[in-house]
């Protein structure tokens, strides 16, 4: 496991996608968290879409901004491949430019040195390769040569972002978003979990800094927990009751793995049904279950982050509920840290409140 350089201690962060159309407002909200991130704002521009951002300079790709479509042509890929390889050692090839994310560059303009850490994100090559199709509607991950280039390309983009963020804060980290990972466990997928594990492990090995994965879907949890990741971010509000029953979660924590518990719902109707007390009780139920299974409770608290359950672009009130969820998240974190004495210098209390 790679050291994060700070103690998680149930501090707050969040996934990247936000419903805002005001860049400065989105940044201000993101910066209220203990570990802020640069927001992805697809309602501002199609360039702010996480798939579009990841494909800047990838051979064979054309971005149709007017119709908001990504086009990939296999013959064009091979035509552009020699030129791409000529530029593959140039960091500029993998840099996220202002055209593809004005928000990212606004984030980098801020003074971020006083935060315990900062975070970035990039779409996983697995989810990207399953989402983008060629001219025959075939996912590009099914093409062996395209897949090989894609994994290397995203790996270099993650590393480039990590280096840029680290200039703003030495404890920066970047996690990969993997919303489509669950698809590889389907019998209908032409890209299965065996190949996926091989490719993912090789991809993770080449990442600089802490290696994190975020997802809101429900994959085979063993697949991730036994991989080479240092950080797992997931929707614990909906999936926590399942994942705590995996023995591999105990092993993950014992080897130093960090869990980001997505606990605060961002859908209006769900958030309205919850309170700080109910969310805290839900979390403590998961933690007590793990404690009974032999997970050291102090260690678990030290190695936990808290986050919203999911991103959300669907609420009728647009950003209002999401901003409320961030407020609730910060309040929940404060309550937990007070109860378990989670500071940078103190050992946390156990689940029953004892030192």
Model regions: which residues?
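Structural preference for beta-strand elements that scaffold enzyme active sites
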Residues: 12, 35-39, 117-121, 171-175, ...
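Non-catalytic scaffold segments within catalytic domains of secreted glycoside hydrolases
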Residues: 58-81, 193-218, 232, 246-250, ...
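Alpha/beta catalytic barrel-like cores
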Residues: 1-142, 257, 289-293, 302, ...
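Short, basic, low-complexity termini and linkers enriched in Ser/Thr/Gly/Pro
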Residues: 343-355
């Amino acid at each position: 496991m790679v050291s994060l350089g700070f103690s998680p201690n149930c501090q707050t962060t969040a996934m990247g996608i936000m419903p805002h159309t005001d860049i400065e407002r989105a940044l201000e909200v993101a910066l209220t968290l203990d570990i802020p991130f640069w927001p992805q704002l697809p309602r501002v521009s199609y360039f702010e879409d996480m798939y579009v951002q990841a494909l800047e300079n990838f051979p064979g790709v054309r971005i149709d901004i007017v119709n908001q479509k990504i086009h990939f042509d296999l013959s064009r890929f091979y035509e552009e491949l020699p030129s791409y390889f000529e530029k593959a050692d140039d960091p500029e090839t993998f840099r996220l430019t202002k055209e593809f994310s004005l928000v990212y560059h606004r984030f980098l303009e801020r003074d971020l040195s006083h935060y315990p850490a900062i975070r970035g994100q990039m779409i996983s090559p697995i989810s990207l390769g399953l989402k983008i199709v060629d001219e025959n509607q075939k996912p590009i991950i099914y093409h062996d040569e395209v897949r090989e280039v894609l994994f290397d390309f995203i790996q270099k983009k993650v590393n480039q972002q990590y280096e840029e963020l680290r200039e703003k804060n030495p404890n920066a980290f970047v996690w990969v978003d993997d919303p489509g990972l669950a698809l590889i466990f389907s019998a209908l997928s032409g890209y299965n979990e065996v190949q996926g594990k091989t490719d993912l492990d090789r991809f993770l090995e080449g990442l600089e800094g802490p290696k994190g994965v975020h997802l809101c879907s429900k994959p085979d949890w063993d697949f991730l927990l036994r991989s080479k990741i240092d950080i797992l971010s997931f929707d614990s509000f909906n999936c926590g009751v399942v994942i705590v029953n995996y023995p591999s979660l105990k092993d993950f924590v014992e080897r130093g793995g960090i869990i980001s518990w997505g606990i605060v719902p961002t859908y209006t109707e769900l958030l309205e049904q919850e309170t700080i007390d109910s969310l805290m009780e839900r979390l403590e139920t998961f933690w007590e279950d793990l404690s009974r299974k032999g997970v050291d409770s102090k260690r678990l608290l030290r190695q936990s982050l808290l986050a919203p359950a999911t991103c959300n672009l669907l609420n009728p009130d647009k950003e209002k509920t999401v901003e409320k969820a961030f407020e609730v998240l910060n309040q929940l974190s404060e309550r937990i840290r007070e109860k378990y004495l989670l500071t940078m210098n103190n050992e946390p209390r156990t689940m029953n409140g004892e030192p």
